Amino acid sequence: MSRKREMPDGGAKSVLSDLRFGRFVGRIRRSRHPALLLLALFVAACWLTWVNFSVALPRSQWQQAIWSPDIDIIEQMIFHYSQLPRLAISLLVGAGLGLVGVLFQQVLRNPLAEPTTLGVATGAQLGITVTTLWAIPGALTTQFAALTGACIVGALVFGVAWGKRLSPVTLILAGLVVSLYCGAINQLLVIFHHDQLQSMFLWSTGTLTQTDWSGVQRLWPQLLGGVMLTLLLLRPMTLMGLDDGVARNLGLALSLARLAALSLAIVLSALLVNAVGIIGFIGLFAPLLAKMLGARRLLARLMLAPLIGALILWLSDQIILWLTRVWMEVSTGSVTALIGAPLLLWLLPRLKSMSAPDMNASDRVAAERRHVLAFAVAGGALLLLATWVALSFGRDAHGWTWASGTLLEELMPWRWPRILAALMAGVMLAVAGCIIQRLTGNPMASPEVLGISSGAAFGVVLMLFLVPGNAFGWLLPAGSLGAAATLLIIMIAAGRGGFSPQRMLLAGMALSTAFTMLLMMLQASGDPRMAEVLTWLSGSTYNATGGQVTRTAIVMVILLAIVPLCRRWLTILPLGGDAARAVGMALTPSRIALLALAACLTATATMTIGPLSFVGLMAPHIARMLGFRRTMPHMVISALAGGVLLVFADWCGRMALFPYQIPAGLLSSFIGAPYFIYLLRKQSR
């Protein structure tokens, strides 16, 4: 017996109509602020382009310069072969970065995925650096090198996370670690081949300078092919946005489709890096803003995100041209980061519903260890042994020697300051990493990842530039202020979202990118003071003195003595704000106190060993993976692991290329990153 479908009466129709209209109005209101922002950016880009073109060439000559420039008029030649290609390349690269960002985020279901956070861009840059160092000619050679570097890094990162079904926490951790590793190799090559790679400073920050149309002619067919392949993968990628089981039930060969889409995104990323260098942030920001504008469907995001990326890079480059005329030449990637970081921080509180998989999903660690004291004693003995070996065992002109007696006394004034400096820096960074991870409840948080080390380093470098003469007395306050300001901005930006890991990482990466770009701008400026700073930024203990070590030790002892007093806070805060309030904890004062403590630890360590140490991320994870999750055991084992790691890194740095030295901060990345990747891979099985 057939049943007639009941139709809603007039009142019900009216209610449904009102509900639909209310949802429509709500969508308009949610997208109003980003739309107004885009409109303002578009107007600013058009106005700056008009101003820059008018200064470069009288408007009466624009038509001739565009179609058939007079070779006898230099201004027309510059307009045709430099400014117009630069405008075109900015639009192409911006659109390409927006497209790549959507591809990565859709396939991985991860709002933090983009070429820089996954390490793909850094791998491509490293490949190009190697070809530049070996002076291998040819445009195809650099393209092949960029593709090779990006593919190797991509295979490593995705291979680590594949066993955990591309878990967001594992994927981003692996990407950040491999990116730091490639960056350390790059920095090492620059230190030993500074003159040959001087031009890489400006290029590596992203520069759109063009001398002809060859770059545009080479890039646009490649991007067009990428767009066509993306459209062919539209249905599989739409299904990839669903649960894996649902996608398989709908007939999708999930692994094959995911591999194809990721390969396309990696290839496009490498081609973009080869064209203009690393321009971060756009691949992260453009898809995010497209989603905030209401583009929920994949096809809508694929159309809107490239337009947003092109607009942002267009505006950034026009600002560069204006700054070059009124101040000095800076890289486009630097301005992109400086524009994008405040915009992202402004938009973060407006992300009402930021959907992402659980950051702690399928996160397995070892069972909680007992007999903590025995492990702590063993770790302390290992640290003392590493220190004694670093003091006594080494190389000279005749080979390997074990120093003792008179020889050891002669070597001691040269060795003990740098070894103790490395040890203390490792301990402080490890403890700071533990505090930050517990304060934020985020396993990916650390001084390096959240940009706190970069903020401290920027504060120190800025003080060196602003204060004449001997400014040592101001370095610790400047570094502490930079670190505290960075962490405070991150917590304010992410606080309205309940300190979710996604918001914390977005804010941290925005600030980290901005500080890193500012430091690279100072390096590329040619200022003679930056030659001294470069070694410190790479994490060298070469200039450590007895007086500096003594002062650092006093500060470290005072700061570490405060940590046990905060044990209750550090135990409760990872449970969330509601749990903390339920047990009567004053949430804001405790967070501010822990914020200040972590900032001072980070600043003191950064002054000693620079911002590239990596220990603050790795040491807490090593302790946690070994089974130490309670507050004080976690702190103690992390501190011991950080101290051992940096002492060993400093010794290897002195011995590996004797008589030349590799900075301990860089070498700690070489030592720590492979082991950390191994632990991540082991967890995924």
Swiss-Prot record:
The keyword Transport applies. The chain crosses the membrane at residues 35-55, 87-107, 120-140, 143-163, 172-192, 222-242, 265-285, 302-322, 328-348, 373-393, 416-436, 456-476, 479-499, 504-524, 553-573, 592-612, 632-652, 660-680. Gene3D superfamilies: ABC transporter involved in vitamin B12 uptake, BtuC. SUPFAM superfamilies: ABC transporter involved in vitamin B12 uptake, BtuC (SSF81345). The keyword Membrane applies. It is found in: Cell inner membrane. It holds the Pfam family FecCD. It is a multi-pass membrane protein. Keywords: Cell inner membrane, Cell membrane, Ion transport, Iron, Iron transport, Membrane, Transmembrane, Transmembrane helix, Transport. The complex is composed of two ATP-binding proteins (FhuC), a transmembrane protein (FhuB) and a solute-binding protein (FhuD). Belongs to the binding-protein-dependent transport system permease family. FecCD subfamily. Part of the ABC transporter complex FhuCDB involved in iron(3+)-hydroxamate import. Responsible for the translocation of the substrate across the membrane. Involved in ferrioxamine-mediated iron(III) utilization. PANTHER family: FE(3+) DICITRATE TRANSPORT SYSTEM PERMEASE PROTEIN FECD-RELATED, FERRIC ENTEROBACTIN TRANSPORT SYSTEM PERMEASE PROTEIN. This is Iron(3+)-hydroxamate import system permease protein FhuB. The lineage of its organism: Bacteria, Pseudomonadati, Pseudomonadota, Gammaproteobacteria, Enterobacterales. The gene is fhuB.
